[in-house]
Amino acid sequence: MFYVTYKMQRAVTAQQINIFDALYGNLPIQLDNQVNQMWYITTQVENPRPIPRLQESLTNLLRVIKTMTNDNPNQYEHFRIPKATHGFRDIYAPAENLKAAQRLIVNWMQTTCKTLPNNAAHAYVPERSALTACKVHQANESKWMLKIDLKDFFPSCTGDFVFSQLKKIYPYCLLSDDSLRELLRFCLLNDALPQGAPTSPIITNTIMIPYDYAIQKKLMSFDEVHYVYTRYADDLLISSKIKFNYNGVVRYLEELLPDNLKIKHEKTRFGSTSGQNWNLGLMLNKDNNITLGYKEKQRLRAMINSLLKDYTNDIKWSAEDRHHAQGKLAYLRYIEPEYHDGMTAKYEQKYGVSIKDALK
């Protein structure tokens, strides 16, 4: 069985269907009464159209990237960065020539294969973000959230798993096994997707298509609860307007997910949306507005106060601390621009200096 992508009529979002859904017209949307269903399937399904010289394009790509990398796909620098909570995250940064080759692979997947991630995926997708994911739950006026993390997501995506998943996705299912495995050689490190490679995000979003689709389809089958599902890389968020049996949902996900993708149970959270951060620090307040939350904004106010106070006393923060502060403020401006502008203006007026100068 393989999965295809179609664009929803008069919309920019996309959905996945398996081939049997397409044949039998089981589309997860309401069709207009004036639209003939078979016409809709044959004209709106986006990717089953033949892709001219697909295999040839991959052969040419492999020739180029082998030359660029001297046929050496194992050129990485390893370093660790602290996680937001505790512990460290392993990052593998490819050498410049390998990174350039991987960007060619990403471009080939986007422009030649044209496989769109499921509309539930919000990480590493143009015009999608943690904010757009949160807006999906906001639009549903969800009051109860289930947050699930997948354990060691990128390292768990082994070469065989990635290969078998891509063979279920159009048009990768049309490629020869040898050429597809050869392509993956330049995307893997120690037989897994390395976090830090340009290719890893688009590959994970692609291989998760069947699972994103299956989760959405299963959740839609429950009559008693209307669920909303989004995924941000390895963070799965399921919400509803009413309290639901989250243990049953977790059990279903454990049955659906493959053996190599394990749920990190110690990080599973369930509760009401009020007063808790659910998606990369974002939350829905009692008025159903997206916010960073009172505690995070309190920390930001203290940070800006300390920054400007030090600056007026000729104490300059380190480049690392200034970069960290810039990132925090940029995220606040993205999520709550009015609050950002009001807060920064208040402290600039208090100290008589600009935050921009203090962060130079």
What does each model-identified segment do?
Residues 223-224:
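Active-site-adjacent structural elements in folded domains
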Residues 1-197, 202, 206-220, 244-360:
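Right-hand nucleic-acid polymerase module
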Residues 234-241:
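Short beta-strand->loop micro-motif that forms the acidic, two-metal-ion catalytic signature
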Residues 150, 233-234:
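Short acidic donor-binding/metal-coordinating loop in glycosyltransferase active sites
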Residues 227-231:
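Short beta-strand
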